[in-house]
UniProtKB/Swiss-Prot annotation:
Name this protein carries in UniProt: Phosphoenolpyruvate-protein phosphotransferase
GO MF: kinase activity; metal ion binding; phosphoenolpyruvate-protein phosphotransferase activity
Cofactor: Mg(2+)
Residue numbers binding Mg(2+): 431, 455
Top-level class of the enzyme under EC nomenclature: transferase
Active site annotation, chain numbering: 205, 502
Annotated InterPro entries: PEP-util_enz_mobile_dom (IPR008279), PEP-utilizing_PTS_enzyme (IPR050499), PEP_util_C (IPR000121), PEP_util_CS (IPR023151), Phosphohistidine_dom_sf (IPR036637), PTS_EI-like (IPR006318), PTS_EIN (IPR008731), PtsI_HPr-bd_sf (IPR036618)
GO cellular component, one term: cytoplasm
Note: The reaction takes place in three steps, mediated by a phosphocarrier histidine residue located on the surface of the central domain. The two first partial reactions are catalyzed at an active site located on the N-terminal domain, and the third partial reaction is catalyzed at an active site located on the C-terminal domain. For catalytic turnover, the central domain swivels from the concave surface of the N-terminal domain to that of the C-terminal domain.
GO BP term (any one): phosphoenolpyruvate-dependent sugar phosphotransferase system
Positions that bind phosphoenolpyruvate: 308, 344, 454-455, 465
Gene: ptsI
Natural source organism: Chlamydia muridarum (strain MoPn / Nigg)
Domain notes: The N-terminal domain contains the HPr binding site, the central domain the pyrophosphate/phosphate carrier histidine, and the C-terminal domain the pyruvate binding site.
């Protein structure tokens, strides 16, 4: 591909990637280069070995200070608990004895320079992750974490660092082949108006950080497109995180059109499709009650559709005490909104590892194995029930027996704590195929149902959620997943039990008409997605939604689903 002419570089030009985080942003493009650090292998004289070890310790200390400062900054801001938990994980990795003992031992034994030894050790860790976990979502995140930490420590060893995205004083759209979580965490959202990376996914740590900061993010471009992007460094850019579009040198009319669409919908527009169409609610997901203030200001009346209680442990670096849980849950109970708020029981396992507790189980089976922890949480819920009503969601159920056990334990705690049993409304999270086929029995024990689409798709297809998947799965759901969602929604509708949907699919505006057509009553999404979903809802009507839903149920391939959703 030849170089782009000067005239072409000044014309409006659009490149399309994959949407990761929704939103619109305008700014000057800033291309972050790959690390130019070249690690050379050096053999040291014996008298320099201890000095080299001290130099390594200093680099580790400086790296820990960097991360601790970022974590402290994140902990002090509303809605940033997930960012803090990711940075806490980086701190735990960098404190690992392997990174001190193994590296120091090798420097002493082989008399090699710290950069070379550290890089080799981190490379071996990455190889072992790839060998054990293949290309799972967990492995991809861990490898990205390893890259991030390696670059930070080696940067200190070589006295070279990337410029901080927190120091910008102009509006920028940041382009990077591999955008790291700590780079995103350090970005000042006042000036950093968008992220664009060669590769990325909606479930990556970088995406989680970007979403928490409400910074639009687009990723996954061909090598040819990325090469062309590099030629536009320094040009004005408009990023559309809903469509995955990057517009270079946007005309004034293009910019005005985008922002007219964005401002056309008031944040408080009623979410009623039409008079004859049942209400479909948009509720907010949170990871801490300190987000309630911003939800109330930006989206008045919005219900909390999912409080992810396990993030209390990630933020604290330990399991929360019962008293701490009571304080959080009471605030959730008392939060004024249009419906009853939803608390999900601790959902540990796989990529969400509970601090200091190793277990092969996940979700409700993890809780039943760790009965003391479960009873502590149920005790806190029982105490909070004195203040009002609360919906409680049991994660990852296999069948009705697990629901019965949890409810029995709760009744015991309610009696001990003088709680009000009637104030707690029990629901079940359907995210495992076995639960889909046991839905009749599960509905008998549940007052509401939440479909967790991320895990449901992953376990149904036997795959990772990450970019290694074949075909179009990362853009559209497989027909089998669509049919499972419909099956659950239809069975629940027969019993007049409300169904909500959470996960990436809930925030996908292309799937909105399908959910409405299936009779889903609520979509639980991260706060930044609410505005764009409201905009999409204004353009829908019930007849078209029902028609599309029926067509999607007849689809046999990814391609047919993709065609129907993009008609």
């Amino acid at each position: 591909m030849g170089a782009t002419s000067q005239k072409e570089l000044q014309q409006e030009f659009v490149i399309v990637g994959e949407p990761v985080v929704p939103g619109i942003g305008l700014g000057k493009s800033l291309l972050l280069g790959k690390s130019s650090l070249r690690i050379r292998e050096l053999t040291l004289p014996q008298e320099e070995v201890e000095h080299e070890i001290n130099r390594y310790y200093k680099a580790l200390k400086e790296s820990r200070s960097d991360l601790a400062a970022l974590e402290k900054k994140a902990k002090g801001k509303q809605g940033y608990q997930e960012i803090a938990s990711i940075l806490q994980a980086h701190l735990e990795i960098i404190k690992d004895p392997l990174l001190t003992e193994e590296v120091v031992k090798t420097i002493r034994k082989d008399r090699k320079n710290a950069e070379f030894v550290f890089s080799s050790v981190m490379g071996e860790i990455e190889k072992s992750l790839c060998a054990v976990q293949k290309t799972t979502a967990i492995a991809v995140d861990r490898i990205q974490d390893i890259h991030d930490i390696s670059n930070r420590v080696i940067g200190h060893l070589c006295c070279q660092h990337k410029s901080s995205l927190g120091e910008s004083d102009q509006n920028l759209i940041v382009f990077s082949e591999e955008l790291t979580p700590s780079e995103a965490a350090n970005a000042n959202p006042k000036y950093i108006r968008g992220f664009v990376s060669l590769e990325g996914s909606k479930t990556s740590h970088t995406a989680i950080v970007s979403l928490a900061k409400n910074i639009p993010y687009v990723a996954n471009f061909s090598a040819e497109s990325w090469q062309r992007i590099r030629e536009y460094n320094g040009n004005l850019v408009l990023i559309n995180g809903e469509k995955g579009e990057i517009t270079f040198n946007p005309k004034l009319s293009t910019i005005q059109a985008y922002y007219r669409k964005q401002s056309a919908v008031s944040m408080t527009v009623p979410i009623q499709i039409e008079k004859t169409q049942p209400l479909i609610s948009l509720s907010a997901q949170i990871v801490g009650v300190d987000e309630l203030g911003s939800i109330s200001r930006e989206f008045p009346g919005t219900t909390i559709g999912l409080f992810r209680s396990e993030f209390m442990a990630f933020s604290l670096g330990r399991l929360p005490f019962v008293e701490e849980q009571v304080a959080e849950y009471t605030k959730l109970v008392q939060f004024s909104c249009s419906d009853i708020n939803v608390l999900r029981l601790f959902d540990f396992g796989e990529d969400k590892v509970c601090p200091f507790i190793a277990s092969a189980h996940r979700s409700v089976r993890w809780l039943l194995e760790q009965e003391t922890i479960l009873r502590g949480q149920l005790q806190a819920i029982a105490i909070a029930s004195r203040q009002g009503k609360l919906k409680v969601l049991i994660p990852g159920v296999l069948d009705a027996s697990e629901i019965i056990l949890v409810k029995q334990m709760f009744q015991e705690e309610v009696q001990l704590q003088n709680g009000i049993s009637e104030n707690i409304i029990w629901g079940s999270m359907i995210e495992i195929p076995s639960a889909v086929w046991m839905i009749e029995e599960i509905l008998q024990e549940s007052s509401f149902i939440a479909l967790g689409t991320n895990d449901l798709a992953q376990y149904t297809l036997g795959m990772s959620r990450e970019r290694s998947l074949p075909g179009n799965w990362k853009q559209v759901p497989h027909p089998s997943v669509i049919r499972m969602i419909h099956y659950v929604a239809a069975r629940a509708k027969q019993r007049n039990i409300p169904v909500s949907v959470c996960g990436e699919m809930a925030g996908d505006h292309l799937l909105l008409p399908m959910f409405i057509g299936f009779g889903v009553r609520e979509l639980s999404v991260v706060a930044p997605a609410i505005h764009s979903l409201k905009m999409r809802l204004l353009a829908l009507n019930s007849k078209e939604c029902s028609r599309l839903a029926k067509q999607l149920l007849r689809a046999r391939t990814y391609e047919e689903v993709h065609k129907l959703l993009n008609m």
